[in-house]
Amino acid sequence: MGPPRHPQAGEIEAGGAGGGRRLQVEMSSQQFPRLGAPSTGLSQAPSQIANSGSAGLINPAATVNDESGRDSEVSAREHMSSSSSLQSREEKQEPVVVRPYPQVQMLSTHHAVASATPVAVTAPPAHLTPAVPLSFSEGLMKPPPKPTMPSRPIAPAPPSTLSLPPKVPGQVTVTMESSIPQASAIPVATISGQQGHPSNLHHIMTTNVQMSIIRSNAPGPPLHIGASHLPRGAAAAAVMSSSKVTTVLRPTSQLPNAATAQPAVQHIIHQPIQSRPPVTTSNAIPPAVVATVSATRAQSPVITTTAAHATDSALSRPTLSIQHPPSAAISIQRPAQSRDVTTRITLPSHPALGTPKQQLHTMAQKTIFSTGTPVAAATVAPILATNTIPSATTAGSVSHTQAPTSTIVTMTVPSHSSHATAVTTSNIPVAKVVPQQITHTSPRIQPDYPAERSSLIPISGHRASPNPVAMETRSDNRPSVPVQFQYFLPTYPPSAYPLAAHTYTPITSSVSTIRQYPVSAQAPNSAITAQTGVGVASTVHLNPMQLMTVDASHARHIQGIQPAPISTQGIQPAPIGTPGIQPAPLGTQGIHSATPINTQGLQPAPMGTQQPQPEGKTSAVVLADGATIVANPISNPFSAAPAATTVVQTHSQSASTNAPAQGSSPRPSILRKKPATDGAKPKSEIHVSMATPVTVSMETVSNQNNDQPTIAVPPTAQQPPPTIPTMIAAASPPSQPAVALSTIPGAVPITPPITTIAAAPPPSVTVGGSLSSVLGPPVPEIKVKEEVEPMDIMRPVSAVPPLATNTVSPSLALLANNLSMPTSDLPPGASPRKKPRKQQHVISTEEGDMMETNSTDDEKSTAKSLLVKAEKRKSPPKEYIDEEGVRYVPVRPRPPITLLRHYRNPWKAAYHHFQRYSDVRVKEEKKAMLQEIANQKGVSCRAQGWKVHLCAAQLLQLTNLEHDVYERLTNLQEGIIPKKKAATDDDLHRINELIQGNMQRCKLVMDQISEARDSMLKVLDHKDRVLKLLNKNGTVKKVSKLKRKEKV
């Protein structure tokens, strides 16, 4: 993987307002310049965007539809692929790496592009240059010889596989619709990989794209897609992390079926898609799956998705459309390739070579993706998921794993990825503001099969990006649908990105176990803010069971992230969902799923189906500020997972902001912090409304999804029982209803399958009736509230209401509440906070949990500090994007870093100050007997004094060095000041004095070191006697024992 190439034909300059931004799409693996002529469609710009922060963004305005350009590109790509192939397998797809540039968000202004125009970038999947290309054209789907070139991942990709995927011609299309103001489009990069069809237009972006990516930050402003290119592996992760945006993909409800129906359709669809406006895409393109990757980060929002894996995809086909809540149109379609596409979905579009067979392989290959790519971002994970379901194997793939309908499956996959992205939305409605953005969803879900991916590559994104965890989707699990969910648990995420403790990791795989990483430790507070971390890219397999396990920590993490919310996030709880992710899966929501509820409401209860994110916006998108909405929609498509994911992501951002709110629900301190949360809550509600759009798409998906998700749900529910009991109750039944529900509630629906469902059962109709109903806070709210009150944690009722928003909300809310509650407890520590049984020392009691490591300031924060903090957080202006599309993010001044400030032991005071004599006991010194010493292991070695000799040798070297310096100084002195002329010149005199002083120092040092060395070696004077004693005493005993054994 070479350094990024300079912009070439692949580079696209966004037209229109975004003129400043350019995308560069590079083949991830190859550096060679593309052979094909520059595509006409793309305008070339000599400069790269990468440098500027804006690179990440792609101008929504620019649209590159040229097929001819694409073709040329394809041909070039093919050359490339042939040029080197790491693997002979055709299936390999080459991941496209999109490198998000963190600064991008800020730098570029977002210009709204004509809403209609889609931007598609076709380029070989080379790593994108820093600039983010909106779309990749995976080229045509021809299967070129796949060279597997490693793409350069942005983030480390844990597995080497990253490079694996050869580049396959695939296109990623990113659709952004600037027009959507409020949603702030996040450019979505859609990768439409057609695996098989070379000619498909990859640009699914329809003109309207609708912003498939929603800009997460400002509701209105588009997000940068900057990070949107998908990088393979680390890059993807990074992208994810950086971008704030979240894309929401919303599958069309009907499409999904259609999609499943015929893989072939995809092709057709593709082309049509091109021409068709984005809006249509969502419906029209059933076959195509849209994977939107949204990077959650503003920056790299979307990578999205890969082509559908063909077969699976096809089934899945449901295209995801990213719907912005604001603009409903957005959709990203991933055409399902022929079903066979492997759909590696590796982020990069995978070549999908066109053969369907690959699909099966893809699973294996997927690994590649997964391994190699952390791509958290949309990373094709979504697609992957589909594919991943290996069992599905080929087209049927829909097959078992996926959702009942293939579409679902695909969705799932995409879903995580997209929604993950979506989730990411930057919205940080909450005061959190900046930090929030990190929430960017990290959900890149990489469903990649590859378990190996076990850890998604973590992507470190900026703080914003959380890493999604990609769950491995295990095809075996039925939950596969949900599987894809991303959890945003920061916790889970493998430690890969520990750094962001906060990020949520999306867990994509439902089945796999989730690896918990306690990322969140720090997260709780900042998590959201920091949000970035986390991202663990690693995929975690969630096991439903595991999930449960996770959930506590997850919750915590999430919470951390969300502070509490996340934790409740149910995802933890959510975990209940069968897909481990389920919780997330719950709803497509995925992460949220269980959380979903939370999400909305959850906020408090992170559990919320929707986003676990604190925002709790109904739609994840909303949640995240702008992007969130998208997520929800996506989730629908994914049915369960996606939606959730989106939400989650958003959530997380919100969480950051909201964290407190969420937290409030969960832990006491958080509760105290409630005020901060309050601020967030309102946002949540708003967000919620956004969610509405989601509902529609959801429906479709949910139906398909429904089955599996539902199934998954119950298990999940059970798993998290403690937290989710209520949820479960609601959920289970609902789970069946879930289908209806899913359809209904946009975001939740899927997740609803689980979560939503829970709430939904009755509501399902409601939901179906309309998101708005769902949204209608009243009903859900009530439910939530009830839940909340019992939970106590739910405290932030308002947050819950948002959940309510989601239709799921009610149930979800409950779930969330339940979850959240436990979760809330969890956040502070891995486990829920308990009141100490005994009165601890006064001091420790004052300090708060004695052992809480994180307790630092946080711990203390009582209502008062919380309020203060909340105010402080709120004080900076909220992020906003000005008319020119430039996004302003308030930066919270951080206290200077000192060694002491960040290390404070909350329990130390209690240890060193005693209230009663009995607290102190003199330690009795035990004198070692000679025999005991002699029997110690390695005692004879120590007696030899090897350490002393080693040290003595080093001291000798020091004296030799000093001697050498002394000699040089002597020569210098003689050379500069011959004879006694020194006195004549002041300067010479001064130099002479300095030399003389240094010589004296050298002598002194040599003498002292030699003396020290000699006295040190005297310790060994008694060596012989000591060894004699040791041998006499030590061995006798040992020998006697051995002899006894021998005798026996």
Curated annotation (Swiss-Prot):
The modification Phosphoserine is found at S442, S465, S855, S875. Keywords: Acetylation, Isopeptide bond, Methylation, Nucleus, Phosphoprotein, Repressor, Transcription, Transcription regulation, Ubl conjugation. Its main location: nucleus. Residues 67-80 have a biased composition (Basic and acidic residues). The keyword ATP-binding does not apply. The N-terminus may interact with a transcriptional coactivator. Belongs to the SAP130 family. This is Histone deacetylase complex subunit SAP130. It comes from Homo sapiens (Human). The gene is SAP130.
